[in-house]
Every structure is written in C-alpha cells, then in structure tokens.
Amino acid sequence: MSEIKIINAKKIYHDIPVIENLNVTIPKGSLFTILGPSGCGKTTLLRMIAGFNSIEGGEFYFDDTKINNIEPSKRNIGMVFQNYAIFPHLTVRDNVAFGLKQKKVPKDELVQQTNKYLELMQINQYADRKPDKLSGGQQQRVALARALAVNPSVLLMDEPLSNLDAKLRLDMRQVIREIQHEVGITTVYVTHDQEEAMAISDQIAVMKDGVIQQIGR
C-alpha cells in the first residue's frame, strides 16, 4: 500500500482549466472517497492518478516515488469501473487470474492468488462460469477480485456500484468496506452518492468545479 500525495495538480481541456492547483494527501491504507456531482472533475482526477489522463501541472506521488511520467502499467494500480470491464469470453477464474498471467508470475503463485481472491470475494463456486451467467453484483465481485489479485499498491474505484440495483448496492458497500479493511490497500473511491460515501469511507473529499472544498471523516 502507498500514501498518495498530489501537489498543485492541474488539468486543462480545450484551453479551459478543469482542475487547478489541487492539493490532497491520501493516507496509506485508507478508503478515501471523492464525492461530487457529474462533471466536477472527480473521475478526471482519478484518471490522472491512474495515468490515463495527461497531467498539465503539479506532482503526483506514491510514497516518495513521483509517478507523473510513469506509464499506467508500471504504476502498480488496480482499477474497478462502473461497467465491470471483465472479459466475457473468459471464465471467472481466468478473469481473476488475468493480471497475474500478464505479469508472468510463477504458476503456483498464480493459482494461490487466484484461489485466495475467489474465496475472499465468495465467488469460488462460480469459478468455471462465464460472466454472462452471473448477476451484476457477482460480476462486480469478479472485477474487484481481479483488481486485488495482483497485489496493487493502490486501488482506484470509479462509480463501481452505479449500475447495480438498490439492494445490490447496499450489499456491495458492505463487501467493499470489509475487503478493503482486510486487505488494507490504499483505495480512492469516486461517487456522486453521499449516502454511499458516508457508508464506506475513512475520509471524504467533497469536490465541486475541480476544487476540493472540504475533507472530513
């Protein structure tokens, strides 16, 4: 796990600053939520941390390592999106193992890590199924297991529950909170849902118009 420090971050779209001089420190091992309405810049900031959006100014650190010019695949992050982003042609087991295969980890470690997160996310009974045979909540568990299996330093979650119905959202809040505590990974969670943010977070940053207006517990 890593502390994330962002100093004077700046992002420009079409000559218009959408984030300017943003400063925030995200404690190591915490579940830190960025809460705000659509278009406030929260997903843009998340994508800057991930390396998917360019950084027009400022410095981004994981612990003491400046990551501005490190390509996304080398930042050791896990990501979970609202649309699950799991591979429909792979089984649940192969989806969870995908990142480990990409990293070419030894086979015994691959099997051990895959089984660990299948069990932790309570999806081992679906290991040989394809995603289209799973519910939305089960698919999101697969996405979370795949993100965590590679032992990332940082987990980034972009509106991960927005496509689920009300009951599944409540269930998955509990799952995310419990798993994050158990694994202890630094997690940045983006949502527009205040109730959701209050239910799962160690800290909440309220964002509007590209500015973090308040941080609280």
Q: Where do the language-model regions lie?
A:
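Conserved ABC transporter NBD signature motif
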Residues: 58-66
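The feature captures the beta-strand-to-loop junction immediately N-terminal to the Walker
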Residues: 35-37
